Amino acid sequence: MAPPAPGPASGGSGEVDELFDVKNAFYIGSYQQCINEAQRVKLSSPERDVERDVFLYRAYLAQRKFGVVLDEIKPSSAPELQAVRMFADYLAHESRRDSIVAELDREMSRSVDVTNTTFLLMAASIYLHDQNPDAALRALHQGDSLECTAMTVQILLKLDRLDLARKELKRMQDLDEDATLTQLATAWVSLATGGEKLQDAYYIFQEMADKCSPTLLLLNGQAACHMAQGRWEAAEGLLQEALDKDSGYPETLVNLIVLSQHLGKPPEVTNRYLSQLKDAHRSHPFIKEYQAKENDFDRLVLQYAPSA
């Protein structure tokens, strides 16, 4: 049975979240829609204006438009926006990443404003990019928002800690079972669980794609469900649709590399996707791991090469 479709969330007071459409678009990966909604929505308080701008600039980051964020967020901007700018600075300037992480380490060692959820999320995002999931989890653990918990679920699944991810998901379900983030986290955990749960995950991704839009995130989620069930041809159709939307999206390219191998495609097809991934995302974990394996192989070849 399909999950309930995302709908306007209301708090305990019964008030509809003014930013529901902005947040929902961001969470499902519809970044341009998020930007459009953020520029259109009229809000009731300066605090909501800041929250809207956080999602607006995070959507620009997701589109790799780092300059927009760096140019528009000023030193006088709210602390939440400064946190987004810090992540933009990290993503835009590879040569400055070590110093940005060192400064972040110093901030985290002091008293952190745990009510600034955006800072915790941006700190965790930087640590995750820096291949330090433990530090990312420590940052997220200080927050109690649904988004902090959803990101915790993602990281735990990357670490193959399905047991802990399930506990975090239970917390999300107790807090708001129908929230978009909770539904997505349910799909991620179901995908990692496998077996009969794969169909549950597929239904969640499909329902969101039908009700909202088939974003790259949702298409790759559906494709991953098919791949886990050995339905390679069905997965290929979804991945081609994703590729048509954005030929440089890393998850699509990684999934196509895996799929091409399983379908026995010619080596040049796989190599083409690999080259696209290297061109657009040379620091992607998949590329780093692939290059490490290549180097290991080259060392083995030299080790067993006949001596002159």
Curated annotation (Swiss-Prot):
One GO cellular component term: Golgi apparatus
Keywords noted in UniProt: Cytoplasm, Cytoplasmic vesicle, ER-Golgi transport, Golgi apparatus, Membrane, Phosphoprotein, Protein transport, Transport, Ubl conjugation
Residues that bear Phosphoserine: 13, 45, 99
Domain of life, source organism: Eukaryota
A single GO molecular function term of this UniProt record: structural molecule activity
SUPFAM superfamilies in the cross-refs: TPR-like
Keyword check for Phosphoprotein: yes
InterPro entries, per the entry: Coatomer_esu (IPR006822), TPR-like_helical_dom_sf (IPR011990)
Post-translational modification: Phosphorylated by PKA. Polyubiquitinated by RCHY1 in the presence of androgen, leading to proteasomal degradation.
Pfam families hit by this protein: Coatomer_E
GO biological process, one term: retrograde vesicle-mediated transport, Golgi to endoplasmic reticulum
Membrane disposition: Peripheral membrane protein
Broad class of the protein's primary localization: cytoplasm
Location in or out of the cell: Cytoplasm; Golgi apparatus membrane; Cytoplasmic vesicle, COPI-coated vesicle membrane
Family: Belongs to the COPE family.
Oligomer status and interactors: Oligomeric complex that consists of at least the alpha, beta, beta', gamma, delta, epsilon and zeta subunits.
Function description: The coatomer is a cytosolic protein complex that binds to dilysine motifs and reversibly associates with Golgi non-clathrin-coated vesicles, which further mediate biosynthetic protein transport from the ER, via the Golgi up to the trans Golgi network. The coatomer complex is required for budding from Golgi membranes, and is essential for the retrograde Golgi-to-ER transport of dilysine-tagged proteins.
Protein name: Coatomer subunit epsilon
Gene: COPE
